[in-house]
């Protein structure tokens, strides 16, 4: 049984009883695109990090482990909390973690700061996904499959765009250019 505890949830529920709220679905899909695009930059810049810092494949694996642990294993716990205490502003808060992580990654001087950076990006994703899924479901107007599909298209498109943008921006211009991806986080915060 779903309980709505926040006035914003009640207003959204009333609004969605009349049908699917496409503007909200498209907004949440666009922010999902931006979120997953920023995440997918991380593995795309592994060759740059390996070359610049002389990392071993084990160190690259540890970077991946930290990112995956924070971006995926935290999600169920955050989702459980979000179900009990809906906080739509947590979407923007998650993007702030990602923003901070991208800036940190763009200036990180070595292995430990890079671990911190990818951990922050992963935490941002863990905070974003459960609440954004909940918002997509609330905006579905009962068309949950359609709503989830629109939401997922954004994430998949973003995951495909990130490596391409990394190849066009980061590889030619270096580690500092990762900071430009923070603009995507700022845009997502403004949309949210």
What are these regions, as identified by a protein language model?
Residues 28, 112-118:
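Short hydrophobic/alpha-helical segments at membrane-entry points of transmembrane helices
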Residues 2-31, 35:
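Cytosolic juxtamembrane N-terminal segment immediately preceding the first transmembrane helix
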Residues 27-47, 55-57, 78:
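Extracytoplasmic
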Residues 40, 68-76, 159-160:
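Residue-level signature of mid-helix packing/kink "hotspots" within the transmembrane helices
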Residues 151-192:
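Helix-loop-helix hairpin linking two adjacent transmembrane segments in secondary transporters
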Residues 73-112:
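Conserved MFS/SLC helix-loop-helix module at the cytosolic interface between two early adjacent transmembrane helices
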Residues 117-154:
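Cytoplasmic helix-loop-helix junction between adjacent transmembrane helices
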